[in-house]
Amino acid sequence: MNRPAWMTVAGCLLAWGLAAGATSAHAATGRPPNVVLILMDDMGWRDVGFMGNEFVETPHLDRLANRGLVFTQAYASAPNCAPTRACLMSGQVTPRHGIYTVVDPRQPPGSPWHKLRAADSRSELATEIVTLPEALRSKGYATAFFGMWNLGRGRTGPVTPGGQGFDTVVFPENLGFAKDAYFDDDGNQLSDRLTDEVLGFMERQKAGPFFVYLADHAIHAPYDPEPDLLAKYERKPAATGDQRNDAAQAATIEAVDRNVGRIMERLACLGIADDTLVIFTSDNGGTSRYTPPLKGGKGELSEGGIRVPLVVVGAAVAKPGTTCDVPVVSIDFYPTLLELAGAKPPAGQILDGTSLMPLLGGRANLDRRDLFWHFPCYVGRATPSSAIRAGRYKLVEFFEDGGRVELYDLSADPGERQDLAAKSPDIAKPLATRLRAWQRATAAALPDGPNPAYDAASDRPRGGGRRDAGKRR
């Protein structure tokens, strides 16, 4: 396997080290910047070093953070993978595109622990939606997709990446990997091989502009870590406090970190690091056993299920090495990248996000806005719910309990330990009213009445579906 360390070529190290002070080609020529969007699978808010994880080693991501802008209150648009990916491609909240979960949510007549019949969920992104790559192609971008799609079945056709705006498409299966496998039969690692393909594409398209969407399978369970990395973390002393100490997970994350380093090295070697905006984030939070100090995990609208790491580096970042505490959400990427590219919003298509260009440019805040999430389905232990965040307060509505709400002050209580709904009705009631008005305005699907198969004595699943044991080669 090709495993170069960060900046193995001295000239590349110098090139990226000076990038922040260089005059970019896009600024000099008017050509739009390149974009590399790296989306991880199930990576929690605190699963990387630059967010305070002291057990896993992520030197390349930490370097990215030191050279970029870290968003400390970044959110996925949904608590599980497919809807977040649909939000990224459409720029719309989940009720508009109708994708709420990656699996069939209804499971007729319903699992015995489901009190309600889950709302229906689309299995593919509607072709009428103008996707982000389609919008960028209108400005001359070469577009490429690598990894997991989850927005339509098949390898060719209108609902696949090739039919939704990507010129180049590479699935794991194209590289000889079985579904959900971390290694192929020859011992090649998936993150390495996907990155090989990304590097080749960037080399071919170095004249730009290009848009790369790398949707890695990592760090989805079951893990299958590289033996040498696994042994390293099994020998490593445990971190203290609420730090996670999962050797298999840490080894999987370090392999991802290595490949982020390879991408940044290649951008520098090609002389286009300063002409490229790199975004690194995750599709949802980790699982409830892996998200401290946050509560809950994947599938849930608690902070542990939707808060994610986010770092942006390169073109348009005015103050490298800084942090931003403004709450942002992944539907913001679509309008941000349109503005970066100088592209107009698609005619007749609602975009629910807000451009982050002012924040990237050094502004301290955005205009005040509410953030919304809607999940009328079941995944793991998660039940149908909807949420609003307005400033420091977040309110969650639980549909199983007749619309019961919980209210949290995230500034004082980011772990959501103290429910303020009963003691602060003056805050909870207006937020609930705004949330329900938003549900009506977006025609949000709701659970479809009681589940006839419900059995109060049945046991719920033990978490968000993550398994510790990996598939061994």
Where are the language model's segments positioned?
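Active-site segment of extracytoplasmic enzymes that catalyze sulfate/phosphate-ester chemistry
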Residues: R46-T131, A135, Y141, R155-T156, ...
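Active-site regions of oxyanion-processing enzymes, predominantly non-cytosolic
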Residues: G30-N34, L88, G140, A144, ...
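Bacterial N-terminal signal peptides
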Residues: T8-G21
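C-terminal cap/loop subdomain of S1 sulfatases and analogous C-terminal strand-loop tails that border
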Residues: G285-P292, K298-L301, A318-T322, V326, ...
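Histidine-centered active-site microenvironments of extracellular/periplasmic hydrolases
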Residues: V56, T156-G165, P222-P225, E265-A318, ...
